[in-house]
Amino acid sequence: MSITPQEALTRCIEHREIFHDEMLHLMRQIMQGQISPVMAAAILTGLRVKKETIGEISAAAQVMREFANHVTVKDRENFVDIVGTGGDGSHTFNISTASMFVAAAAGAKIAKHGNRGVSSKSGSADVLEALGVNIMLTPEQVGECIEQTGIGFMFAPTHHPAMKNVAPIRKEMGVRTIFNILGPLTNPADAPNILMGVFHPDLVGIQVRVMQRLGAQHAIVVYGKDGMDEVSLGAATLVGELKDGEVREYEIHPEDFGLSMISNRGLKVADAVESKEMLLEALSDVPGTPREIVSLNAGTALYAANVASSIEDGIRRAREAIASGAAREKLDQFVRATQQFK
């Protein structure tokens, strides 16, 4: 079922939904540059103002996956993505990136999909480059890295070439659009499990149900009530969990896991170099807030990956991986693996 750009814009203005097949058609046109920049910007604005529905987001994510350069991973057990929407304005160090190394050291397989900075002064791509990682890998090379180390990093522009038709429009608009919430939904390795942080509490219930429609196995979507797109130490965290086909929404608190509630102020960084230093502190078992929040988020990722039976069990495994030096060694191993392709 097709819809003209003008009809789509009218639906948005009238706060009516664009149906699944219509959204597929519309999104394909946008991704292929078949809609003028003015009309594309108007539709993206209209969707944002009326608020994107679960059906619209699911269809748009499906199209982005169609256009992606995919990564093939044979062994998909305990396979997880750890990702945030960004845009939370917290300017913290790269917690999800640090958590990736800890979770991999504790037995998860990670396919992390990331880009340069949005919410932080340093996106996952920025800090990985600062650590010496070669992020410019082909899909085949990413697959090899996952086989060798249990970690693959997929730099979004490499894996979503069709975004070149949308990037100038998004840049000129300078406001959040549906694409800000599509990134975490469009992992090119199709990881069946995910820990996803979001920038707004309303997105917890929306994104977990989108993941349900997209066929995820175990999805955990989180929003820290202090505004973080991570599991927070500074406040309660809203959780949407998809497991065994069922969605559950609940709150967790640091105290639930024997952790103290600590302000996240000490996690702020100015750039990728500061983020790298804080990440290395956490992986090197230096006592402090960075280590604690990485243990909490890596533990949640281990639960999402079905390595751990609960978040609490995951935190215990994460702490062991850090204390034993395995997490730091995993980082070094990953740097070496990516450098072999230079």
From Swiss-Prot:
Gene3D superfamilies: Nucleoside phosphorylase/phosphoribosyltransferase catalytic domain, Transferase, Pyrimidine Nucleoside Phosphorylase, Chain C
Domain of life: Bacteria
SUPFAM superfamilies reported for this sequence: Nucleoside phosphorylase/phosphoribosyltransferase catalytic domain (SSF52418), Nucleoside phosphorylase/phosphoribosyltransferase N-terminal domain (SSF47648)
Residues holding 5-phospho-alpha-D-ribose 1-diphosphate: 84, 87-88, 92, 94-97, 112-120, 124
InterPro entries in UniProt: Anthranilate_Pribosyl_Tfrase (IPR005940), Glycosyl_Trfase_fam3 (IPR000312), Glycosyl_Trfase_fam3_N_dom (IPR017459), Glycosyl_Trfase_fam3_N_dom_sf (IPR036320), Nuc_phospho_transferase (IPR035902)
Binding site for Mg(2+) 2: D229, E230
Cofactors (names): Mg(2+)
Keyword entries, A-Z: Amino-acid biosynthesis, Aromatic amino acid biosynthesis, Glycosyltransferase, Magnesium, Metal-binding, Transferase, Tryptophan biosynthesis
Residues that hold anthranilate 2 according to the record: R170
Catalysed conversion reaction: N-(5-phospho-beta-D-ribosyl)anthranilate + diphosphate = 5-phospho-alpha-D-ribose 1-diphosphate + anthranilate
GO terms for biological process, alphabetical: L-tryptophan biosynthetic process
Pathway membership, UniProt: Amino-acid biosynthesis; L-tryptophan biosynthesis; L-tryptophan from chorismate: step 2/5
Residues binding Mg(2+) 1: S96, E230
EC number: 2.4.2.18
Molecular-function GO terms, alphabetical: anthranilate phosphoribosyltransferase activity; magnesium ion binding
GO cellular component: cytosol
Binding site for anthranilate 1: G84, N115
Cofactor note: Binds 2 magnesium ions per monomer.
Family the UniProt entry places it in: Belongs to the anthranilate phosphoribosyltransferase family.
Subunit architecture: Homodimer.
HAMAP family per record: TrpD
Biological role: Catalyzes the transfer of the phosphoribosyl group of 5-phosphorylribose-1-pyrophosphate (PRPP) to anthranilate to yield N-(5'-phosphoribosyl)-anthranilate (PRA).
Name of the protein in its database record: Anthranilate phosphoribosyltransferase
Organism lineage string: Bacteria, Pseudomonadati, Pseudomonadota, Betaproteobacteria, Burkholderiales
